[in-house]
Each structure stands twice: as C-alpha cells, then as structure tokens.
Curated annotation (Swiss-Prot):
Disulfide-bond pairs as recorded: none
Protein name listed in UniProt: Ribosomal RNA small subunit methyltransferase G
Functional note: Specifically methylates the N7 position of a guanine in 16S rRNA.
Keywords tagged on the record: Cytoplasm, Methyltransferase, rRNA processing, S-adenosyl-L-methionine, Transferase
Annotated region described as Disordered, given as residue ranges: 216-237
Binding site for S-adenosyl-L-methionine: 78, 83, 129-130, 148
Species name: Streptococcus agalactiae serotype V (strain ATCC BAA-611 / 2603 V/R)
Listed Gene3D superfamilies: Vaccinia Virus protein VP39 (3.40.50.150)
GO terms under cellular component: cytosol
Coiled coil region boundaries: none
Family affiliation: Belongs to the methyltransferase superfamily. RNA methyltransferase RsmG family.
EC number: 2.1.1.-
Amino acid sequence: MTPQAFYQVLIEHGITLTDKQKKQFETYFRLLVEWNEKINLTAITDKEEVYLKHFYDSIAPILQGYIDNSPLSILDIGAGAGFPSIPMKILYPEIDITIIDSLNKRINFLNILANELELSGVHFFHGRAEDFGQDRVFRAKFDIVTARAVAKMQVLAELTIPFLKVNGRLIALKAAAAEEELISAEKALKTLFSQVTVNKNYKLPNGDDRNITIVSKKKETPNKYPRKAGTPNKKPL
C-alpha cells in the first residue's frame, strides 16, 4: 500500500488527512526504520508494508466506527513501536493516549517519536501491566484499552479489564479469527464481569485476514485482579 493509496482509502471513509498528518506518518515510517537498526521494533520495514500492516492495520477501529475524534482516554498495552495507538492519535488528535510497555528501550523510542511528531496528550510508562493494573492512578481510569497481537483473550482480559471504567471497552486486534479463543476465555471474562459485544472478521486491502474483538466491562473488577506479574500468563483464569 503506497502512501497515496493509504490517503485514498481514508478519503473513502470520510477522512481527509492534512499535510501535517501526512508528514507525521512519513516521519513515523522514517524513525521506525532508523530505530529498528538499534532495537528490535518490527520485522516489517518495507514502506508499502509498513503503511498497510502497521498504519492501516492500526486504524481499523476508527475505520470501522468504534472510535471517534473526541477526548477519549485510551490505554495501549504492549504497543511496541506504538501500534495501534499512535496511528490513531495522528488521525484523531483529540484522543488521549497512554502506553505501558515492559521494555524501556521501546519507551525511549516512543518519547523521541512523540517529540518529532509534535504530539500532545501522549503518556508513556515503563513496566508490567499487572503492576500498573493495581495502581490507583491507572486502575479503572480509561474509556478504552487497545491491544494488538498481545496475548490470547484468556490472558489479555486479566491484563486489560482492570484499567477500564465501568462500561469501558477492550478493543483487541488480531491476525486470525478468535472463536476458539473466546470459548477458552469465557470463565476469565465472567470472573472479570465483562462480556464480548463485537467479534468481527475483516480483510486488509491485500486480502489478509484480520479480527477485531470488543469486550465491555460491566462491573468493577474484583480487587485481586490482575494477579502479580507473570501469573496471568502461567495460570490463566
């Protein structure tokens, strides 16, 4: 997907990028490739692949109408090089983005990226989701949590749901259909007082399969969740 094809798809969805936004995506691509030489950020470095499999893929929740350009508080868990939240922030500057990542080198990259892109309303924290999920500053404070190819729902639910306000939404993006995964996650979702409201398969413009799952939080999370770092992965609910 060339940058021009990317812009055209957005126009077809009613979004026309300004010159500033186009430049932000261009700078994002350049910094991603430069920094990838120093730290492992992505296996995808070809320009057209980055625009398709990182930029376009990241904005799926916007293109499908699940996020609008309003002062939503969004937490991105395990964003790596900033996906999906930074492309969404470029598109919709009104949203407020927080990223938690367990690798400090990636946080350093994100700080430089945000500075170069002149983004405001972005916050980056180094650490484990399990630890932040028990911190009152972060717990039950977000409208939306996003996670792109982070973990199976059975594990992901415990890492993300505690951060949501009641009626907040987890938006999980994956490469493959998630039917079996959701069956395995039924107990975890019930324990965390949350339920699946959307589970939708779609395709990228090149035909690759993708899946978006949205989980809504119905009641406050029991205090004991998330359990200590590493436990959700080793002993899923």
